[in-house]
């Protein structure tokens, strides 16, 4: 489990829950971009898991490169993406690239269609 820390007024770090740190994750239809140094992939998958546990359809992809997920997690076709959404799982799409440890931006047609499916397959309305 990922621990998110927030500095208090006294400069002490205290743990913060995912829904407190990122309340928009409980709302549908958001695009999240992660920038910066280390920890992006870990945070990305934690956010994806949080979204799935809260009834969201989650599509994970990249506009540049992303560490390659285990092969069984990766979705290469729209049918695979649909199966993941129907099963209540996150879908991960991306293209192969020169670096065997990473995936690259997916083909545009797969991305656009998968993005639309993510919105249309919303299967749970969250309480407010």
State the predicted function of each range.
Residues 1-30:
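Extreme N-terminal, non-catalytic leader segments
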Residues 2-6, 24-25, 35, 52-57, ...:
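Core catalytic machinery and nucleic-acid-binding channels of phosphodiester-processing enzymes
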Residues 22-52:
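Walker A (P-loop) phosphate-binding motif
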Residues 37-42, 65-66, 124:
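Gly/Ser/Thr-rich loops at beta-strand to alpha-helix junctions
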Residues 49-103:
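N-terminal phosphate/diphosphate-binding loop that engages ATP/GTP or pyrophosphate donors
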Residues 103-111, 124:
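Conserved mixed alpha/beta catalytic, RNA-binding, or beta-rich assembly cores of soluble enzyme
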Residues 116-119:
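Loop/turn-to-beta-strand initiation segments
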Residues 122-128:
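Conserved small/polar residues in nucleotide/adenosyl-binding loops
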